[in-house]
């Protein structure tokens, strides 16, 4: 963990292309959290992947009584597991694709023609494998040797995402859905952060019925997973309507990220959003705050 000035952070103009170098050696995470607890800090979480999103960091904060933004440890861990998250979303009435066992990979490819495989516990579309030909099955099997993969039939359609926001006054609502138009291929990590040709249209060009369904399903997923503060759920708009992909309990909040675009479309200033999330974080730990 490093202590970094606002000026240094703001001066890092290309965060997804150039690695940020904080300049000091930093201290261990546990020591930094002990320091935050002693100083009565509130943490605004902006980390991604691994222990930052799987509930481990959140549990470390909870054990120390440190207020933090976003979902708690149990919800974070549940949403980070794509298999479990799909199951809970389906219980809430959200359409989710069927999973495919690795042993049935060849038969599933013969039946569906196209498949998609992704790490069961990761974010930002890391590790996506599109199975469009038989030789792609080898890549899936090799990837599944080192970590668990979710394998599903490929669902054709428009990519969409929809945020949910909880406010300190008790109001909870869905933000305007965003339509994603990848410039080249699929909306993987490169398309999300590096390709200028990718379009993120907010509000999306959806029919009123599809927009309403996206907002309803995002809210259902948020509640089914017991998310806190804010979340963002990704979908594919198939011929049968929105199909659930995953829920992000710590969606990106950079200038290139989707959630701030939805806040802007809703007429919410980003600074006001952060201030309100800090109030919520304090209130969870200190109810009188």
Give the location of each predicted region.
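ATP-dependent carboxylate activation and anion-phosphoryl transfer catalytic cores
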Residues: 207-289
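Hydrophobic beta-strand scaffold residues
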Residues: 4, 67-68, 96, 115, ...
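A glycine- and small-aliphatic-rich helix-loop capping segment at beta-alpha/alpha-beta transitions
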Residues: 59-68, 133-138, 266-267
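Phosphate-binding site of ATP-dependent enzymes
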Residues: 132-216, 237, 242-243
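Short, flexible, mixed-charge acidic loops at enzyme active sites
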Residues: 59-62, 187-194, 249
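Active-site nucleotide/adenylate-binding loops and adjacent lid/helix of ATP-dependent enzymes
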Residues: 33-38, 76-157, 168-169, 212
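ATP-binding N-terminal substructure of ATP-dependent carboxylate-amine bond-forming enzymes
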Residues: 1-69, 73-74, 78-80, 84, ...
């Amino acid at each position: 963990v490093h202590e970094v000035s606002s000026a240094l952070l703001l001066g890092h103009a290309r965060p997804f292309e150039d690695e940020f170098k904080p300049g000091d050696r930093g201290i261990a995470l546990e020591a930094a959290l002990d320091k935050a607890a002693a100083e009565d800090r509130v943490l605004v979480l902006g980390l991604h992947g691994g222990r930052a999103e799987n509930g481990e960091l959140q549990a470390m904060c909870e054990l120390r009584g440190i207020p933090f933004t976003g979902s708690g440890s149990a919800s974070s861990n549940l949403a980070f597991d794509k298999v479990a998250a799909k199951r809970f979303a389906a219980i809430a009435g959200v359409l989710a694709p069927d999973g495919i066992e690795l042993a049935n990979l060849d038969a599933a490819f013969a039946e569906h023609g196209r498949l998609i495989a992704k790490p069961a516990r990761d974010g930002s579309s890391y590790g996506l494998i599109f199975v469009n030909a038989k030789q792609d099955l080898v890549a899936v099997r090799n990837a599944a040797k080192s970590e668990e993969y979710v394998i599903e039939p490929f669902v054709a359609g428009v990519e969409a995402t929809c945020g949910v926001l909880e406010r300190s006054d008790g109001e909870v609502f869905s933000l305007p859905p965003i339509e994603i138009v990848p410039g080249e291929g699929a909306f993987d990590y490169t398309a999300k952060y590096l390709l200028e040709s990718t379009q993120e249209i907010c509000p999306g060009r959806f029919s009123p019925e599809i927009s309403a369904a996206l907002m309803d399903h995002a809210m259902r997923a948020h509640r089914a997973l017991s998310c806190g503060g804010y979340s963002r759920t990704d979908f594919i708009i198939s011929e049968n309507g929105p199909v659930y992909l995953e829920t992000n309990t710590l969606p990106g909040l950079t200038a290139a990220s989707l959630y701030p675009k939805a806040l802007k479309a809703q007429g919410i200033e980003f600074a006001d959003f952060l201030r309100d999330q800090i109030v919520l974080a304090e209130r969870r730990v200190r109810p009188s705050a």
